[in-house]
Amino acid sequence: MRKWLEKLFILIVKLNRLYSKKKIELKINYNFFEGSFIDRPNRFLTRVNYKGAIIESHLPDPGRLKELLKPGVRILLKKESGEHRKTKFSTQAVYDGDTLISLNTLLPNQFTAYLLTKRKIDFLKEWDIHKKEIPYGNHRFDFQLKRENEYMYLEVKSVTLVEKGIAKFPDAVTERGEKHVEHLGAMAEKGICTMVLFVVQRPDAKLFQPQWERDPKFGFSLHKAWQKGLEVRVIHMKMTPNNLLYLGELPFNLNPKS
């Protein structure tokens, strides 16, 4: 029955994408500066060649990113201000061939909030944003949504890794992410409405699945939480230097690899 439902869900997603013709986009209201990646001294710092000068830039995404951050690839930087900043730039995106991929882990939350406010996510059209960064127990979740007298706890996860058309999360071991889905699953088991929304920050994915090779614990925790009632959804977007374009929902496969 579960496999039959998954096939039906994939068919519905494909039909929705086929008949959804209106572009949904969020404008980017700042300028980018293009450079080429040199190296990454630590998780939060990149060195970039910008017009012949070597500059240091803050990296918002602390993930592994080895498939993306290769010497010489094109990088988009944003100029930052603030007297306490250690760098004057932040690394916002990277080109994988002609595909632009966001490296800003805050963008999925901002884009999700925009889509929720505009009621553009079909499966969340009836929900309003009630609170952000809402605590529950020892955890904090991105959104609390409200529909009449019903509440939902929503956690958003950023996805940047795609291999052979399959989006995968995480790209490195995430104990925090594992605890998040375990807690959401326990809440769902008690009758509390919970959802984890994976936002794929690139347009070249056809399917989502856990990254079993690098973090099987997260994959098993997600699958178990899903079986307990945690709702799992996946959307994806396309980034250009001028906007973020919503591409709709993606199908997923959470079945553990044998």
PLM regions and their residue ranges:
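Conserved catalytic cores of phosphodiester-cleaving nucleases, focusing on short active-site segments
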Residues: 35, 141-171, 184
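Short, charged beta-turn/beta-strand-edge "cap" motif at the junction between a beta-strand
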Residues: 39, 79-84
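Short aromatic-glycine-enriched beta-strand elements
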Residues: 43-47
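Short nucleic-acid-contacting surface segments enriched for D/E, G, S/T with interspersed K/R
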Residues: 64-75
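Acidic-basic catalytic patches of nuclease active cores, encompassing PD-(D/E)XK
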Residues: 66, 97-130
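OB-fold/S1-family single-stranded nucleic acid-binding modules
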Residues: 85-97
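Nucleic-acid nuclease catalytic cores
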Residues: 165-175, 182-214, 236
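Domain-level recognition of nuclease-like catalytic cores that cleave nucleotide substrates
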Residues: 201-258
